Design a protein with these regions (language model features):
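Conserved phosphate-binding elements of NTP-dependent enzyme cores
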Residues: 1-976
Length: 976
């Protein structure tokens, strides 16, 4: 292009302050700065949005209505744009049908690969099934050794009762001479009488031959005749071979000659779990089914039936309705309504949950129910399968009587039929598990019966990317198959190699996208873009290094450089030092966050940045650094997970210290999230009566002697605090409740009879009804993006005139919501509760946020710190466990220091904190480190090292320790 730069003039979007700049094209450009300084606004809301908007505008009006419309950014001029592609973390698919394979489109090539190159095997007996033409069958027979004796036979009857005399008579009339009956050869004139009550097998002998030159014509006639009588099947009998090897069965159809199971011809649709042709009928291609989990229905086994042990009925009238029937059940099985569930016998528990049969016995197999319900492995033996089989068909017939108890779970299954509202209520008592038909493979048996060498498509998708590449490299095909295989193998290996290059070699293609971190999902899309081979595009990425161990960063940087060298502009929002230092151009925004940011502090090369006086430059040079704690806390006890086998974890016993800040580290795919999120968090959540999906597999969970058990568990992530502009920091932290109470107590409000609800913009009364309390009105533009205009009635203040007349200390409610946290704290200094909550927001570094700032404008880091502030506002936190997965995402080095102080403040209040993190500052600031590894995927799953950061550094087996050692050397040099 003629323009070597993307030229931006007077950008005022969000908090940007009329900035103008030139972003070099065809370079790797990194945008850095504090959280909320305007980085994402510049990269995504201006460069990407305008590039995408202009591309969409170039299409016809008809095409535009099917594409998402981007808002026009608030900027005076943008020139030099190219089509833009956004790779954000927030767009991780929650669709249960999206997998790594489908998103990267590798699965599409795999479906063709297995359809064209796969061989069918009988799902019942496992024998190969191959539809062959008559010519191919003749060629196979003539390939027998010269001089081989053989018979061409047509199978007529297989294991069918009857005398079959009519069939023998008809064959004699048609001129045939010999048959084989139940393995013995006879002429048609001396076939013995057959017992009509026994099953018989009959083969017609069409021809007897010796393999030699010149027999092809005769053989062709015999094969054609045998296939006609055998309805597409024939048997070649070799009498000179050993017993059991004499019969070779051929078929012109995809039918197992032994089991008579017919299989459809392989097609790409057969291997799609999103197609009715391929999806498992039971789970409709999801791979999982839901069932009612007894541990969620009755999480507190110390309660009795009449004290609310059964949560679905604890706060409703259902228990009173079922009380007579339950009392009668207790008389039959030795319990009363006052007996704690933990004192029930196994049979009584099974009857309570699954009902009784006609003889008063448990309707479901109760083996393992007590063990699992009391806190062991989550898998409920066959109970999930039992529910689906038994109750799906008869839920409508469930009846309650004193003579026979139908079971709590059948009654809840019946409730699932009462409509969507009931299903939502009952959802928290249900659990997901692998589909018992396809065992999580998502596909029909017919699709799984097709294999290439030793693997079907589901088995291939369960391999790690690294193993999948090795398997493909070992495949060799001949003849026609080689021509088909060559382009498919090339495309598959290329795309898998791209995934390996971005550090995702440990993932499997069957992994659900919903289970991936934002960083992993973004790198998957990055790998897809590498495979597309586009040039002249502007790629906009949001912290691609998130989720990557420092060991894997180099490969990621190589990938970004590869994109740039193809002739693309790569614009990266990033805080990682290595990525910043690898950039061609660095743009730093600041100086602060929110209203204190939005200015360009620096633009230039990395050497120029290192000489500049900016916040980022000071940290890169070592002039500023994050202080480390002077001493490490001692654990207040231990929580142990026994024999953890979740995902790639290898039966480990893992000890978590209580009352300290613990950092779980390790290379990508080593098992950190499997251990902390899927196992620790989910099992503790279930024990506390919370609903979670498919917790990891463990043998048990225990506490050390004297340790205080976890009584509350909180996962603090970076998801938004609200999905609409109505949500804001004031509403989330409950500050708004106090503010509304204060306004309701003013003389003006009391005189007018205004209650606190009058000062809410979410309900009628005080809000502006013209805009519904939004302050904006949406104008539909049909083929253009919707436009939001400030409400003419309230002028964007959300409230009606009468409400705004009420003032406190000279400000009305709208003006108070427009105050930054720092000013609001001084404004409400006479209200201790309010002042304390605002002080906590300041402590976590959010003093610049406006109280009423819409949640949709907050960054992930800001949202996370608001959540932490709400927890810090609680007076005491003993017995609470906080789990954070990569909390430094989106945070500048300066803000990481603030976050570390906040997490230590949680521990000082008596809480335990477990953090999954790669950031070396966070690791060095922890009391305890648990390092997973040694590699990723199948090479991980072990606890490599555990102890203080100093112990990890001293451990030669720890990859993390080596990076920590280098970091400590750098820190000492900076302090020098």
């Amino acid at each position: 292009m003629n323009n070597p730069c993307i030229h931006i003039e007077k950008a005022r979007q969000h908090n940007l302050k009329d900035i103008s700049l030139d972003i070099p094209r065809d370079e790797l450009v990194v945008v850095c700065g504090p959280s909320g300084s305007g980085k994402s606004t510049l990269a995504f809301d201006i460069v990407y949005a305008e590039g995408q908007r202009r591309y969409v505008e170039s299409l016809s009006a008809y095409a535009r209505q099917f594409l998402p419309q981007m808002d026009k950014p608030d900027v005076e001029k943008i020139e030099g744009l190219s089509p833009a592609i956004s790779l954000e973390q927030q767009s991780t698919s929650r669709n249960p049908r999206s997998t790594v394979g489908t998103v990267t489109e590798i699965h599409d090539f795999l479906r063709v690969f297995f359809a064209r190159l796969g061989r069918m095997y009988c799902p019942s007996c496992g024998r190969p099934i191959e539809a062959r033409s008559a010519d191919e069958i003749i060629t196979d027979i003539m390939a027998l050794p010269q001089g081989s004796k053989f018979m061409v036979m047509a199978p007529l009857v297989e294991l069918q009762k009857g005398t079959h005399q009519d069939k023998f008579k008809k064959l004699r009339a048609e001129g045939f001479a010999r048959v084989r009956v139940d393995g013995t050869f006879h002429t048609l004139d001396d076939v013995p009488a057959l017992d009509k009550n026994k099953k018989h097998s009959i083969d017609l002998v069409v021809d007897r031959m010796v393999n030699k030159d010149g027999i092809r014509g005769r053989l062709a006639d015999s094969v054609e005749l045998a296939l006609r009588y055998g309805e597409g099947r024939l048997t070649v009998h070799l009498p000179d071979r050993p017993e059991g090897e004499r019969d070779i069965i051929h078929s012109t159809t995809s039918v197992c000659p032994h089991c008579h199971i017919s299989l459809p011809a392989p097609s790409p649709q057969l291997f799609s779990f999103n197609s009715p042709q391929g999806a498992c009928p039971r789970c409709v291609g999801l791979g999982t089914v839901d069932y009612f989990e007894p541990r969620l229905i009755a999480p507190n086994r110390g309660l009795s039936l009449n004290t609310g042990a059964l949560l679905p009925w604890a706060e409703s009238k259902h228990f009173q309705r079922y009380e007579p029937a339950l009392r009668a059940l207790g008389e039959r099985h030795g319990f009363t309504l006052s007996t704690p569930l933990e004192d029930f016998s196994d049979a009584a528990l099974a009857c309570l949950f699954y009902g009784e049969d006609e003889k008063g016995r448990p309707a479901a197999h109760s083996s393992g129910l007590r063990r699992n319900w009391m806190g062991g492995n989550v898998a409920m033996d066959a109970t999930g399968d039992y529910q689906s089989e038994l109750f799906a068909g008869r839920a409508a017939d469930v009846k309650v009587s004193e003579e026979r108890w139908p079971g709590v779970i059948p009654l809840l299954e019946k409730g699932m039929q009462y409509g969507e509202a009931w299903r939502e209520i009952l959802a928290r008592f249900r659990q997901s598990t692998d589909c018992p038909d396809c065992h999580g493979a998502r596909l029909k048996p017919e699709a799984l019966a097709v294999r290439v060498d030793d693997l079907n498509i589901a088995q291939f998708c369960s391999l790690s990317v690294e193993r999948a590449l090795q398997w493909l490299e070992g495949r060799h095909f001949d003849g026609r198959h080689a021509l088909v295989a060559e382009p498919l193998l090339k495309e598959l290996t290329h795309r898998l190699s791209f995934m390996r290059n971005v550090g995702l070699e440990y993932l499997s293609l069957g992994r659900a996208m919903a289970t991936l971190s934002g960083g992993e999902a973004q790198r998957i899309r990055l790998a897809s873009q590498l495979g597309s081979g586009l040039v002249g595009v502007t790629y906009v990425l949001d912290e691609p290094s998130i989720g990557l161990h420092p060991r894997d960063n180099e490969r990621l940087l190589g990938t970004l450089r590869s994109l740039q060298q193809r002739g693309n502009t790569v614009l990266v929002v990033e805080h990682d030092e290595a990525t910043i230092c690898a950039a061609d151009t660095v743009i730093e925004l600041g100086p602060g966050s929110g209203s204190q940011g939005g200015e360009i502090m620096f633009q230039g090369s990395v050497p120029q940045l290192l000489r500049a006086d900016t916040l980022t430059a000071r940290y890169l040079r070592g002039d500023a650094s994050i202080s480390l704690p002077d001493e490490r806390r001692e654990p207040q006890g231990w929580l142990t997970l026994h024999n953890v086998t979740t995902n790639n974890l290898r039966g480990i016993d893992c000890r978590f210290p209580l009352g300290v800040l613990t950092c779980v580290t390790g290379v990508s795919g080593s098992g950190k999230s499997s251990l902390v999120v899927d196992t620790l968090y989910k099992h503790l959540a279930i024990s506390l009566g919370q609903r979670v999906d498919q917790p990891g597999t463990i043998a048990g969970l225990s506490y050390s002697e004297g340790a205080r058990p976890i009584e509350r568990i909180v996962a603090i992530d970076q998801t938004p605090i609200g999905r609409t502009p109505r949500s804001n920091p004031a509403t989330y932290t409950k500050v708004f409740d106090e503010i509304r109470n204060i306004f309701a107590m003013t003389p003006d409000a009391r005189k007018r009879g205004y209650k606190p609800g009058r000062f809410s913009f979410n309900v009628r009364g005080g809000r502006c009804e013209a805009c519904g309390g939004d302050g904006q009105i949406r104008v539909e533009m049909h083929f253009l993006p919707d436009v939001y205009v400030t409400c003419d009635v309230c002028k964007g203040r959300r409230y009606n005139h009468e409400t705004l007349e009420v003032r406190y200390k000279g400000l009305n409610i709208a003006e108070v919501l427009d105050l930054p946290v720092q000013q609001a704290r001084a404004f409400f200094e006479n209200y201790p509760v309010l002042e304390r909550r605002l002080a906590v927001l300041e402590e976590v570094g959010l003093e610049y946020l406006r109280l009423g700032q819409p949640a949709t404008t907050l960054s992930g880091g800001e949202a996370q710190r608001i959540k932490i502030s709400r927890e810090l506002g609680k007076r005491s936190l003993p017995g609470t466990l906080y789990i954070l997965d990569e909390p430094t995402t989106g945070l500048h080095m300066h803000e990481v220091g603030k976050l570390i102080k906040v997490l230590h403040a949680l521990v000082d209040k008596g809480a335990s904190v477990v953090v999954i993190e790669h950031n070396t500052d966070m690791i060095l600031a922890a009391d305890h480190v648990l390092d997973m590894g040694p590699g990723g995927g199948e090479n991980g799953g072990l606890v490599v090292s555990q102890g203080t950061p100093e112990a990890i550094v001293a451990d030669p087996d720890s990859v993390t320790g080596r990076f920590l050692m280098q970091e400590r050397r750098d820190r000492l040099k900076r302090r020098g």
